[in-house]
Every structure is written in C-alpha cells, then in structure tokens.
Regions:
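The feature marks the mature, well-folded catalytic cores of soluble enzymes
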Residues: 1-213
Length: 213
C-alpha cells in the first residue's frame, strides 16, 4: 500500500472512531436495517402458489396465455396446438436446451432472426406474486430468444414457481451469476401514446406459457 493511500485510510479510520468493523459485524448491522419482507409482501393466503401465478400471468395487464402438460416431452405437441390455434406455420427458433425433444412436424432452428415469428424458450423459474418469468442466460438458454419472437412460447416447470420474489432468489448467492438475468412480466407493451396499451412495442406481442408437471 502506498504511503499516501495509507495516510488517507488512517485518517478515515480515525474520523470514524477507531478500528474498522469486521465483515461479520458489518453484515449483522446491514441485516438489522432490512425489515421483515413479509411486511411488504401482498397476502394471497386463499390461493395456491400456482393458482396465483396463473391469475397474474393471464390478467388483463399481462395478457399471457397458458397451457399445461404432464411432461417435458409433451412440449412440442403443446407448441403445435398453439401454431394451429393462431394459424401459424409450424416453424420456430428454439432454445438449445429444448433441442433434444421430438419436434417431428415442426421446422426448428436454434438460431434466431430479427424478424422471428415464433421463439420457444425455457424459463429458469416463475414468481407467483407478479406472474413473472425468470430467465438466466447460458449457451443453452440464449437471451435473445426471449425478445425477438413475435410469439414467445415459454416453457416453465411447475415446481420452479416461487410464491414471492424473495423466495425466487433465496440462496442465489450460492449460485454462479449468469451474464444476464431477466424478469419478464407479461407481453411487451407501452402506453406512452394517449395511454393506450400497444402490445409488442419492444418485444413479443404474444406470450404463451407452457407449464410442465
């Protein structure tokens, strides 16, 4: 340490009243400043976690649609049903994490185009409190797939839905942080012009969530 820097740090320490606190003391003090999260969490005791997620995700504000399947192997059929319902070509850009599924009858690619009509991705989890999806970037779950498709089909494991935001990230400090971590809450939209909600302004116009399990 340079003598100039040492002098500065010593002066700061003296001004603060002596020795610097240990990391444990600092952590304990910080935790004492954080209120119990339950104080600010919305109560929905009459609903199960998944029922709350369904209600929020399909609300008028978020405008997502839902399908439920029993197994991850059923995802391609759920996607085919969505294509048929919306008159779409059976073609999609999919996350590499889903490439091993049987996509017979659907033309797939793991590369995504700027004008992609349909993208199919795998969510890391969900949050019942807000109806949000959690996406972590990785080679198997590239982030652009969540934003470039006009129709975004997101695959979500039922057991990965947390009740509250805090629960979704409890213990996250033990995991390696991804390069990008995104929370997606409903379809893309803006109400900047005349307070009219325009869907698809900055991303997917349609969000379809396939819940597995």
């Amino acid at each position: 340490m340079s003598s100039a820097r040492e002098r500065i740090l010593n002066r700061i320490s003296e001004a603060r009243g002596g020795a610097t606190k240990s990391p444990g003391e600092i952590l304990a003090e910080a935790q004492g400043l954080i209120p119990d999260s339950a104080i600010s969490q919305p109560a929905f005791h009459q609903q199960t976690t998944i029922d709350r997620f369904f209600e929020k995700a399909t609300s008028e504000r978020l405008t997502a649609t839902l399908a439920e399947v029993g197994d991850i192997a059923d995802v391609p059929q759920a996607a085919a049903d969505y294509f048929a319902e919306h008159g779409l070509a059976h073609r999609a850009a999919i996350a590499p994490a889903l490439a091993s599924l049987d996509w017979t009858g659907t033309e797939i690619t793991t590369a995504i185009d700027a004008n992609q009509e349909v993208s199919i991705t795998l969510a890391d989890g969900g949050i019942a409190e807000t109806g949000s999806l959690i996406f972590r970037s990785s080679p198997d779950t590239p982030m652009l797939h969540n934003y470039l498709g006009l129709h975004h089909i997101a695959v979500l494991r039922r057991e990965s839905v947390a009740r509250y935001l805090e629960e979704a990230f409890a213990g996250a400090e033990d995991d390696a942080m991804p390069r990008i971590l995104s929370l997606v809450t409903g379809t893309s939209g803006t109400a900047d012009i005349e307070a009219v909600n325009i869907r698809g302004a900055h991303g997917p116009r349609y969000l379809h969530i396939v819940v597995v399990g």
